[in-house]
Structure formats: structure tokens, C-alpha cells
A protein has these predicted regions:
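Bacterial Sec-dependent N-terminal signal peptides
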Residues: 1-27
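Solvent-exposed strand-loop boundary residues in beta-sheet-rich modules
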Residues: 47, 106-108, 167, 214-218
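Accessory beta-strand-rich segments of carbohydrate-active enzymes
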Residues: 27-42, 70-173, 198-199
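Solvent-exposed, conformationally flexible loop/turn segments
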Residues: 71, 129-130, 185-187, 230-234
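Short, solvent-exposed loop/linker segments at the N-terminal edge
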Residues: 178-188
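Residue-level detector of high-confidence beta-strand sites
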Residues: 66, 111, 222-224
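Hydrophobic alpha-helical membrane-insertion signals
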Residues: 26-68
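Beta-strand-rich binding/interaction modules
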Residues: 102-104, 187-229, 235-239
């Protein structure tokens, strides 16, 4: 038999539970300062090095392997060389064990509330030529985290990370589509889309050269296309 007092206690417990959840929800920080999602894209100084594609450090690409951890904070240094002048400085982090804030030289520049997916951040306006300090600060666990997820508390951790430099007019993403065409002699066909982004403050017309290589390293197609972008514009070239 349920008494009136027991029923009231149950109702008050439910109200208290939802109040805790509401307070936790109010602590949510939305993502800001993150680049649009894209596939993994590496930068090489020359077509020859790009064809080798071994993923090692080069003139415009540096892995960040040495981090100093203090609690929920991971800190490292990176250098912006003179060769990166008038170019974009991008930071990519593969994953983290919690949502995180990005700080450059002590300044908060971005926040990512989707810690499980790779994310990129444009640090161009915040990094200076020479040595810079980069900090990834993981958020503290929510007080009602156990109510929100079945996962156990994870130790603070971050995934693979690197910084790279791209030109002011850059390839932001690469989209591919392949299919087998019986109309073309049972050949495998491919369509490639290059998402081109301009960070310039004035309209620009540029020519994009391309070379498609087969898995065996042989040239399958070459050519170029012209593209005109307005101030900080973006468009897709299809080959």
C-alpha cells in the first residue's frame, strides 16, 4: 500500500533528480572556433613529396608528440617559422577523453563539445612567428555524468595532434566518388571534388592543377581548372 507520505517523497525525489539534470545542462558550453569538419588532409611542399605520402614531418607539417600533462591540462610548444608567413596555421586534434578548450599563448581561442571526433582549429590570428604555447584543457566531469552515460570515468587523455600551414587560398576538403561503368568498357570511374577556400580580403582568381595517381603510382589523369572566389569565399571544383 502506497501512503500519501511515501508518494510525496517519491515525487520530491524525482523533482530533485530532474533539477540536478537541469543544472548540469545549464553548464553546457557550445562549440566555437572550430573549422568545418573534413577528412584527414596532409600538406606537402612539393608534388613529389605528396606522391610519397609517408605522413612524416615536413616544411609545412609538424606532429605534436611531446605534451606536458598537469591534471586535465595538456601543454606543448610549436614554432611558426618564417616560411609560414602570409599562410594559414591550422591545429588538428584526433580526439580527447572529454570536451576541451584550446588556448594559444594563454588566450582561449576555441572550444569543442564533440570530443570523440577529429577537429581542426585555425590559429592564424592567435599564433605569432617563432615559439608559441598551445594548451588543451579538458572539461571536468559533470556531477551527474553517471546518469548521462554508462561509461566509467576516463583518465584525461588526448589523441594524435599536429600543426600545419596552408596558403591563403587553400584546399579545405577533398570529396571522392568511384563506380564501375559498363558504358566505358567496364572501367572503374572516379569523380573528385576539391573544396577550395579563400581567406583573402579581396576577390581572387586562381588556377588549380591536379594529378590523379593509381594505387600503383601511375598517372591516371592530369589537368587544371580555374576558380574565382570572392572575399573569404568557398566553392567546389569537380574533375
Amino acid at each position: 500500500m502506497v501512503t500519501k507520505n511515501n508518494l510525496m517523497r517519491s515525487i520530491l525525489s524525482i523533482i530533485a533528480l530532474f533539477s540536478c539534470c537541469t543544472l548540469a545542462a545549464q553548464e553546457y558550453i557550445p562549440t566555437y572556433g572550430r573549422e568545418p569538419m573534413r577528412g584527414e588532409l596532409l600538406v606537402y611542399p612539393s608534388a613529389r613529396e605528396a606522391a610519397e605520402a609517408d605522413g612524416s614531418d615536413n616544411k609545412y607539417f609538424k606532429h605534436l608528440n611531446e605534451w606536458t600533462q598537469k591534471g586535465n591540462s595538456f601543454t606543448t610548444d610549436f614554432t611558426v617559422p618564417f616560411a609560414w608567413a602570409n599562410r594559414q596555421v591550422l591545429f588538428r586534434l584526433g580526439w580527447a577523453s572529454a570536451d576541451y578548450e584550446i588556448r594559444v599563448n594563454g588566450e582561449a581561442v576555441a572550444y569543442n563539445s564533440d570530443c570523440n571526433a577529429p577537429a581542426e582549429f585555425n590559429l592564424t590570428r592567435h599564433a605569432k612567428e617563432g615559439r608559441n604555447t598551445l594548451e588543451v584543457i579538458l572539461s571536468s566531469p559533470s556531477k551527474v555524468e553517471r546518469l548521462e552515460s554508462w561509461k566509467n570515468d576516463a583518465s584525461p587523455a588526448i589523441g594524435a595532434a599536429w600543426v600545419m600551414s596552408q596558403p591563403t587560398l587553400r584546399i579545405r576538403d577533398i570529396l571522392t566518388k568511384t563506380w564501375r561503368s559498363t558504358e566505358e568498357g567496364d572501367n572503374v570511374m572516379a569523380e573528385v571534388g576539391l573544396v577550395v577556400k579563400s581567406e583573402a580580403l579581396n576577390p581572387r582568381t586562381s588556377r588549380v592543377h591536379y594529378e590523379l595517381l593509381s594505387p600503383a603510382g601511375k598517372t591516371s589523369a592530369t589537368g587544371y581548372k580555374d576558380i574565382k572566389l570572392n572575399m573569404r569565399g568557398e566553392d567546389t571544383l569537380r574533375f
